Amino acid sequence: MRNREDRARGGSVAFLALAACVAVVAGGARADDVAARSWANVVEDDRAIRIETEQLEAVIPKNSPKQWMTGIEKGTFLDKATGFREVGDGLMVIDWLMEPGSDEEWPDEILGQEGHGLHRYTWFANETDPARRDYALMAHGSSHRKRMVEGPQLCHRMKPVRPEVIRGDDYVAVKTTYQFEYAAPGRKAGSTWTQLIVFPRGERYFVLMDRIDSVNDVDELILRNDTPGCVRHERGDTFSEMYLSYLGGPNGVRIPSSEFFEPFPPDLKFGYRRDQNRTPEHFIRAYHLRDPKTGADGPWLAGLTLEPSVVYEAWASQRPGGIIVMIEEIHGKPTKAGESFGAAHVVGFFDDIPSMHKVYERYKGHTGLEVDASGWRLLK
């Protein structure tokens, strides 16, 4: 009897020990899972999605934005290491699908009212009022006319969206899609824009892709955006200099903020056109943040377009009203209905210019981005 009881007690002890080990392993796995996800916090409500990592904060609007829809919301992109934020109207905001050419012959009766529906591009030749003509020259210059292919201008007129939040062990991603709602004469509406934003663990930047799935045949189809974003300033109070890697030779050009004290059109200086400029090794646009209260320099905020050849045109022009517009247009190539094109970018905070180029070398040559259960990856 005693032997049976001893064996029973021994079996019970062994079972309990095994159960304890299983519990420890399971508990450890759960703890590891919690730890893996604790580096990033995602808060979503009816208006927006807020992402907070160990390095960054950012908000992606769903509706009722502080300034523009698409991309990262105005003033929300925070570098925790330095306390500096983006100082424009948001990051990587999207305009519309365009092509070179004139819209003067479009009949007035097909145009929308007060910015809603199809409208002509703001161009000096379309304007009779002197003030409007001057604004058009400052906004878009006079040398490379364009027109809308499909609208609306998403940053201004996009309806509320429901982005998808995707989480992995080493990333948080947000995916937004939208179909263009109206089109120019002879075109169809319905091309799809997709923006995928990935926040990798441990980085002071995000990786972003814009992709277009076209429903039209267009000889030079263009997607326009702001890369990384516009700059708001009063005589250089928020930034000390700008860096453009694609101008001024192989090392790029550093431009003091004083060059942006007075308005100038985009085709006067600091412009890039693929048909007129050498395609650079790296395509980087960055501004050096400055504390407006103390004048002390902070980090650089940079946008890296990872395949330079996709850039069709880019400018950094000072408009009236204290804003530098950082337009970047991609693709500008023959596109058939059913075809797709896109660009991939890295946008974030950097301590210096060499660190931008180091990250560029790590990711260069890519135009696409995808995520799944195994992680995130750039695509060529």
Task: Briefly describe each language-model feature range.
Residues M1-G10:
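N-terminal secretory signal peptides that target proteins for export/translocation
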Residues A14-V25:
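Bacterial N-terminal signal peptides
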Residues D33, V207, D217-G298:
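Polysaccharide-binding surfaces and accessory modules of carbohydrate-active proteins
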Residues D46-E181:
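Acidic-aromatic substrate-binding/catalytic surfaces of carbohydrate-active enzymes
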